[in-house]
Amino acid sequence: ADWPDVRTLRLEMLTDTPLAYLETLEHAHCRREWEWRAWARDGSSADSITVAAITASGRWVGTMMSKVPHGAPAAFLYGVYVAPDHRGEAAGVTDALLSRIEDWARDRGDTLSLEVNEANPRAVAAYRKRGFVETGVTRPYPLDRTLRELEMRKPLR
């Protein structure tokens, strides 16, 4: 991946929906070029995948990442973002990205899990619509411990 595109999309993500990520915009702005280059280079491996939606003009408009944490029985979805002007069923970006992640995750386990901030009802609704259900497990959001992260899971088989 081209690191300037990765950086631009990450900064857009953190500006648009700061509660959705475990990094602040201020922290991202402090990253050095070599860090962005490493992030772009290391996007996928045997136990992780990064997918991106890129328009015909080359603009990055969405991304999702998944990994199988060490010792975990299934994949975890994170780093989800679709640009506001590409959201919604008509655009199909979310479904296309998620379909690719699910295909990858299906080879690694029976479920796909995620954590979503309770203060992001749009995301919670989008995940529910796509078959994710809350497990009842919650955790404090690391950047604001007054908020909770809801664990959601989707069966893949």
Describe the role of every protein-language-model region:
Residues F76-L77, G92, T111, R122:
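Amphipathic alpha-helical recognition patches that constitute DNA-binding helices
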Residues A1, G71, N117-P121:
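Short, surface-exposed acidic/glycine-rich loop or hinge patches that mediate macromolecular interfaces
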Residues D2, E102-D103, D107, A119:
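Short N-terminal alpha-helical targeting/association segments
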